[in-house]
Amino acid sequence: MNRRTFLGGLAAIGLQGSMLNVSASPLARMMSPKRKKKVSGRFDEDAVILISDMHVLPNGHTPGYLTRVVKEILAMNPLPRNVIGLGDLANLYGHVEDYECARQLFAPLEEAGINLTLGMGNHDRRENFARVFPEKAVTTRLFDRMVFVVKTPRADFIVLDSLQESPDLGKWITPGAISQEQMDWLRDTLRGYQKPVFVAAHHSLDETKVLPLLRDCPSCCGYLFGHEHRWRTDSPVFQWGKRGILRTMCLPSTGYWGDIGYVQLHLDEDRAVATLHQSEYFFNYPLKEGEERPLQWALNAQDNDGSHCSFSYQRPG
């Protein structure tokens, strides 16, 4: 059956018009983002790159993966105005050498004029981070934590510090937590916030316990986190029986283990749309020379790459 015969049959039963006008339906119009780029010279002011779990170890495998991500970002035209990292910049113990290596790897981004914001994860050490990135540490909103605010024309980002430092420099504390001082600061900051805002941390909502504060801020449109080394999205409800939900997104690792890649977030007029760029999957270390890639690893990366996650600025409920 050719296309003309097929459409003729649809017309005969009254379906052709309804099928061909789907693009004009209210739902279709709602689904189409209102995209009008704010380009300033070489930069897209509405483009944000999100990365996490770099685990930079000099002489390890992770610097090569992070270098690839940096090169891909620099190849974008226009360039994103902001890159935001959500913790575990250092490998395991937050050594100064890890941060020094990371600084060299990130240098091309800052030399290109891209704003770089780096949050804390459970493998970081604040003092060592501040020693290598002093200009970033001084911008923290709280004296004893690394808490940052990134402002863009259409939405802002609050990067919390969920790191719990072990008194033993040879150990780390895996679970995350938000200090009471941060909780109080976040509550005060979000009170009356009118602009769309994302709240982010290294750890998930189960550990940071900030969901009640986000619920009370209608302009909070999403929660971003890392730590799990996997691409994962969700929409937790605030209260059963009510319509309120909050979109959440877990970032992949740039190159340690698990889902490997980064997320490109575009801020449109009425929503933000995240796109996953996943290059591969491996556990718990990359393939050795001559080793065959497991089919499931390849399928994981294939299934995830190009996935989207959208955040409406008008939160339901």
Question: Which residues does each predicted region cover?
Answer:
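A short C-terminal boundary segment appended to hydrolase-like catalytic domains
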Residues: 266-317
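A mature extracytoplasmic/lumenal domain signature
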Residues: 52, 161-164, 203, 278
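Extended active-site neighborhood of metal-dependent phosphoesterases/phosphodiesterases
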Residues: 27-36, 40-42, 95-187, 191-193, ...
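N-terminal active-site segment of His-dependent metallophosphoesterases
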Residues: 25-99, 191
